[in-house]
Amino acid sequence: MKLLMLAFVFLLALATCKGDEFVCEENEPFTCNQTKLFNSGNFEKGFIFGVASSAYQVEGGRGRGLNVWDSFTHRFPEKGGADLGNGDTTCDSYTLWQKDIDVMDELNSTGYRFSIAWSRLLPKGKRSRGVNPGAIKYYNGLIDGLVAKNMTPFVTLFHWDLPQTLQDEYNGFLNKTIVDDFKDYADLCFELFGDRVKNWITINQLYTVPTRGYALGTDAPGRCSPKIDVRCPGGNSSTEPYIVAHNQLLAHAAAVDVYRTKYKDDQKGMIGPVMITRWFLPFDHSQESKDATERAKIFFHGWFMGPLTEGKYPDIMREYVGDRLPEFSETEAALVKGSYDFLGLNYYVTQYAQNNQTIVPSDVHTALMDSRTTLTSKNATGHAPGPPFNAASYYYPKGIYYVMDYFKTTYGDPLIYVTENGFSTPGDEDFEKATADYKRIDYLCSHLCFLSKVIKEKNVNVKGYFAWSLGDNYEFCNGFTVRFGLSYVDFANITGDRDLKASGKWFQKFINVTDEDSTNQDLLRSSVSSKNRDRKSLADA
């Protein structure tokens, strides 16, 4: 009988190993954490599996000029996080970058997405005012270290840390002067590092700075209408987000044009922006909610993808926003249209959308209201789409499937890299609890499972996946109250060891599973049950 049972288990494992037969679960309990059954072998050869970070969140402030997040978190420390945290020191990757590479090597990572700090390379914001040789040395060391370990660098030029001097001089992205300054900064980066960096990202999450930085005032530079937040030093939540978004697109396109004109033929690299994505589900079965869901997709994704693919904003945005939405000149439209070789897509959560036609007074109106939708974490029956992501939202692993398919079918089958996907845990947990982050394994493996599935079923052109994040770091607006890392950072002793969490050990095995790995891993906590495979998704409830 024992031999018969062993034979049955072996046959079950053998069948489940086949990528096209592995079942992806939409909700707990998850079984995808078994690296013997689901691993990098479910993806094509050469698929990049990496981790990600950004300069302000990991480098620390040593050796660079001030940026808008420095000023923002010091002027409004409570907005930097409930713990009043900021990026003054954080992980000190500026001096401890070799530790980062060692952790990535331990993870078996084949790629690393990081950003260059504009105010580190150009402390006074402009190339004409001087280049910092210390920054060149630092980034050369990091890039060379990655290449030596056969890790592919993906380098972001702007991850929200605008030099403060440019914000002071002309209000940063509110002014078209930013286009030339960003172009010059990008040109310098291509010149200095482009012989080794073959994957450039212009701007991280085009949606975020206009909305959180200029509509809500929750992010740097913290502008908004007075009645949205009395602490905002100035702003107009109805108009400024559209101006900033417009200038971001022009700056992005100018950088892409410089790369294609001066460097691409010799350096043989690629360049594109990063989009923050979400999947949206109807709040209920009404046509109004279904229509609101489509509007949410357009105002969230199409706001930027419309210009990038067609050289103009979506018609419904023009109808709803009116003259608050800027126009592209013919020359600008031609420059913006098609200004990407690939798209980086960040994906974390799914929301429900319901119709909201309420007209509010102009002094409390924000650009986020223009889609005439209300976004919620639960639907009309009180159901969430999946397990908790944080105190206010939930995740839905199949959402990544739908997002990838949506971008393929809506925006012309682009080359895609998943440039962020990750899960937070409380920042106040002790070492033992923080490193036993099994819920992060569930999050990562369930999303990777649906990513593999959509690539196979829909032939979506995805070539890489970067987990957020390499290690614990400063989290925008949350300080150190949350941890996203696959490795543990002790912020009371940042020079200490960077220990892999359970999620890091899982990712390590996922990337490079070996025959020596036990089938009955200690990570295998979820049972394989037909009941779980057959149960209805909460997203459909």
UniProtKB/Swiss-Prot annotation:
Keywords: Abscisic acid signaling pathway, Disulfide bond, Glycoprotein, Glycosidase, Hydrolase, Metal-binding, Plant defense, Signal, Vacuole, Zinc. It catalyses: a thioglucoside + H2O = a sugar + a thiol; Hydrolysis of terminal, non-reducing beta-D-glucosyl residues with release of beta-D-glucose. Expressed in guard cells, phloem-associated cells and myrosin cells. Its main location: other. SUPFAM superfamilies: (Trans)glycosidases. The keyword Glycoprotein applies. Residues 1-19 form the signal peptide. GO terms for molecular function: beta-glucosidase activity; metal ion binding; thioglucosidase activity. Its EC number is 3.2.1.147, 3.2.1.21. A beta-D-glucoside binds at residues 57, 159, 204-205, 348, 420, 468, 475-476, 484. PROSITE patterns: GLYCOSYL_HYDROL_F1_1, GLYCOSYL_HYDROL_F1_2. The keyword Metal-binding applies. Changing residue 427 to A: In strain: cv. Ag-0, cv. Ba-1, cv. Mh-0, cv. Mr-0 and Tac-0. Belongs to the glycosyl hydrolase 1 family. It seems that the absence of a catalytic proton donor in plant myrosinases is not impairing the hydrolysis of glucosinolates. Degradation of glucosinolates (glucose residue linked by a thioglucoside bound to an amino acid derivative) to glucose, sulfate and any of the products: thiocyanates, isothiocyanates, nitriles, epithionitriles or oxazolidine-2-thiones. These toxic degradation products can deter insect herbivores. Seems to function in abscisic acid (ABA) and methyl jasmonate (MeJA) signaling in guard cells. Functionally redundant with TGG2. Hydrolyzes sinigrin and, with lower efficiency, p-nitrophenyl beta-D-glucoside. Homodimer. This is Myrosinase 1.
